[in-house]
A protein has these predicted regions:
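Structural signature of beta-strand start/N-cap positions in the alpha/beta core
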Residues: 10, 41, 67-69, 121
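Active-site phosphate/pyrophosphate- and oxyanion-stabilizing loops and adjacent acidic/basic residues
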Residues: 27, 55-58, 84-85, 110
Length: 141
């Protein structure tokens, strides 16, 4: 854990039509955050989704009211707009974000957390080589 005092943590996901992945992604993020700090929140920015992403997120807010919330955009504002809303909504010391399509495991935040130290202000992670499942490769073409 960084420093001597636990930091607080915001995890957020911009999401657009991610009904197939967003529920499990949020639950995984909640589980991971709880192992790192008692002071955490998970936020999803629903960027005008036309599928049932919004309904799934509303149900998750009922199930996890203490640590989960959603920001709904009535119309799609694009990736940059969703990121801006996510950063605006985040209230904790540290902020972690990744996309709502579950391409990345929110559990990776634990590796970033380990890299923090009193003299480190910013940590960034990325995949050096991707190992996408077949459906991700097909969708990406």
């Amino acid at each position: 854990m960084p420093g001597t005092t636990p930091h607080s943590l915001s995890i957020f996901f911009p999401a657009y039509n991610d009904s197939g992945t967003i529920g499990s992604l949020v639950i995984r993020a909640l589980q991971v955050a709880e192992t790192l700090t008692p002071d955490y929140e998970v936020i999803v920015v629903n960027d005008g989704s036309r599928d049932n992403t919004g309904e799934i997120l509303d149900e998750l807010t009922r199930l996890y009211p203490e640590h989960f919330r959603v920001v709904h955009h009535v119309v799609n504002r694009g990736y940059g707009g969703a990121l801006r809303s996510g950063f605006d909504a985040a209230t904790k010391d540290l902020v972690f974000y990744t996309d709502g399509d579950a391409q990345y495991d929110p559990g990776e935040v634990t590796e970033l957390w380990k890299a923090l130290a009193d003299d480190v202000d910013w940590v960034n992670g990325w995949k050096i080589s991707r190992s996408d499942p077949l459906h991700r490769i097909v969708i990406g073409r």
